[in-house]
Amino acid sequence: MKVLLLLCSCILVIHALPFEQRGFWDFSMDDGMAMMKDEEASGVGPIPTESIPDVGLPPMDLCPFGCQCHLRVVQCSDLGLTSIPKNLPKDTTLLDLQNNKITEIKKDDFKGLTNLYALVIVNNKISKINEKAFEPLQKMQKLYISKNNLEEIPKNLPKSLVELRIHENKIKKVPKGVFSGLKNMNCIEMGGNPLENGGIEAGAFDGLKLNYLRVSEAKLSGIPKGLPSTLNELHLDNNKIQAIEKEDLSQYASLYRLGLGHNNIRMIENGSLSFMPVLRELHLDNNKLSKVPPGLPDMKLLQVVYLHSNNITQVGVNDFCPIGFGVKRAYYNGISLFNNPVPYWEVQPATFRCVTDRLAIQFGNYRK
C-alpha cells in the first residue's frame, strides 16, 4: 500500500503544471498592456506530446541580477542601480527602472529593445541623455522620466511616442523643433520645471496634436502663446499668472477642462472665456479675483466652476445662469465659493437657478 501511495505521489508531481509567478508587480497600464498580456496567455489547445520533435530548448535571455522578469515586463526598481542594466531581454515591452541612482543614459543602453512599449525611469539622478540613446526604441509609446536632473528635453525622441511625462526636472527652455515629427503625441506632463514664458520658443509646439498639457508649478507669468489648438485639457495651476487677456484663449475651441488655480489672477478681460464653447470645468480657485468672471452665463456646457479662496465680495443674480429664457445645455453640478469675503446670506437664491442640486453649491466659511 505504501508503495502504491508513493507511485501516485510521483505521478502527480510529474504531471503538475510548472510554477507561474504572479502578482509581483501590478503596473497600471492602458489597454495596450492588457492586450500584450492576453497575447502572452493565449493558446491553441493541448498538443499531443508525441507530435512535438525533440529540438532542445531555445536560447533564453537572462533576467538581470536583482530584477524580476515576467510576461515581457522587466522590473528593476528600488535596487540602487547607478546605470542601465546590461543584457536586458530583447522581447521586453515594459522596463521599470524607477527609484534608482542612474545618472546617465548612454548610446547603447537600449540596444536591441525594439519591442519596448513603455520606459519608466522616474526618480533617478539623470542629467545626461545621449542623442542616439532612443534610436532603437521605434515602438515606444510611453516615456516616464520625471523627478530627475534634466536641464533640457531629450533630443530625437521616438516618432512613435504618445505620452511624455518629464515633470520635476530642471528644464528652463522648450526650443523650437524639440517635438518635431512627433505626430502621435497626445499627452505631455512637464510641470514642476523652472519654466518662464520666455523659455518657450515660438513654434515649440508646432505640429503637435496634443489632447493634454500640464505646465503647473512653473514660473509662468501669463498663458503661453502658440500651444496646440487641439487641446482638451490645459493645466497651468501654481504659476504666477496675473491676468487673462481676451486673446489668450482664442485658439482653444476644443478645451473642456482649464486649470488656473493657485495663481495671482486679478483680472479676466470681458469675452476671454467666449472662445471655449465646450468648456465643462474651470478652475480659478486660490487667486485674487474680486468678482465672478464675466461670461459664465453664456457657457452652455460649463458644469464645474472653482472660485473658492479669492477676494470676491459680491455675487450677482445673473453671474452664473442665463438671463430670461436663456437655456444652459448642461446644468452646473459644482460651484465653489467658500473662503471669500462675500456674505453668503445676502446672495439671492435665484442666483443658482441653473444648478442641479443645492448641495452642489459650496458656500460658507465667510472670510472677513
UniProtKB/Swiss-Prot annotation:
It holds the Pfam family LRR_8. Residues 17-37 form a propeptide. Keywords: Disulfide bond, Extracellular matrix, Glycoprotein, Leucine-rich repeat, Proteoglycan, Repeat, Secreted, Signal. One of its GO terms (cellular component) is extracellular space. Belongs to the small leucine-rich proteoglycan (SLRP) family. SLRP class I subfamily. The keyword Secreted applies. May be involved in collagen fiber assembly. Residues 1-16 form the signal peptide. It is found in: Secreted, Extracellular space, Extracellular matrix. This is Biglycan. The keyword Glycoprotein applies. Disulfide bonds join 63-69, 67-76, 321-354. InterPro entries: Leu-rich_rpt (IPR001611), Leu-rich_rpt_typical-subtyp (IPR003591), LRR_dom_sf (IPR032675), LRRNT (IPR000372), SLRP (IPR050333), SLRP_I_decor/aspor/byglycan (IPR016352). Glycans are attached at residues 270, 311. LRR repeats lie at residues 82-102, 103-126, 127-150, 151-171, 172-195, 196-220, 221-241, 242-265, 266-289, 290-312, 313-342, 343-368.
